[in-house]
Amino acid sequence: SLQGLGTGTVVLGIHIAAPGLAIQPGDALDETSRARLSTVYMPGYKITMLPQDVVDAYTLSEGRAVPAVSLYVTLDEATLEVKASETKLERVPIAANLRHDQLDALVTEAWLSGADVSNENTAQRLPIQREQLSFLYRLALHLKAQRERVRGKPETFNRPDYNFKLVDHDGSVPTGDEQVAITTRQRGAPLDLIVAEAMILANSTWGEWLKSLSVPAIYRSQASLLPGIKVRMGAKALPHAGIGVPSYAWSTSPLRRYVDLVNQWQIIAAARHGKTAALAAPFKPKDAQLFAIISAFDAAYSAYNAHQGSMERFWTLHYLRQQGITELTASLIK
């Protein structure tokens, strides 16, 4: 959400679904999500971390008011300097969901700058004004440039994301005989960048906030960009060289990653109790449970990603067979 555009001071709202307001550590839903640790994705199907009716109840779907953990960031409209941030637990009315697959062709750099008016009739039906999206895109570019200065080199999006879709599939477990369509989506498109930078801003801001309150959280860190230096998960707020932020706590996907749900519980405690949050948070400093969760999540997440990769390879080979492709032209780089 965006408030104050044109006044010189803008308030950006980043609103995250809040299952952590209802699910409590140790209850039945916590046990279910802790057993699965993450939603598992594969072409045409997914196994959700939480029961589907719980996901449906808390997801930020348009046309209703839903519980949210909201981060409000106050910015200077001209310089984009962050002046303040505040976290609120609230019910947020969702006016509209903007979807990449429907809008990437319309929301381009040229359209945001006003240079492209070819889709003006379609744009008039958008539930958000071009001026708002233009500001969000300018902010996203600014945040990305700031991170790249810390990284020491720019991020590149040379490889597209591949989307796999099973044609006319009803969402049931695939048999392997379905017709598959494979499309590409170039990373770094305006909507993609706006969402990505907002999530990074939330994860890094909340990570630093929890650190300042001595509230434990699960962080991702990377010591440097040197070859062989991997991203690690731990309970210490350390810099993430790959992203270019002083600390990074996954907190923006609590419906599909258990680490984010754990961090959301800690954020909720911080929002409710402020400076005494460390005493009220579910997980205390050096909590053995926190380290057990990190270990279990690391193993499960790696296995799930490997499974997703295997399934995508299967459907890629299936696609080649369906299309009758027997020969490909390639470039070999030694």
Question: Model-derived features: where do they sit?
Answer:
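Electropositive polyanion-binding surfaces
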Residues: 1-334
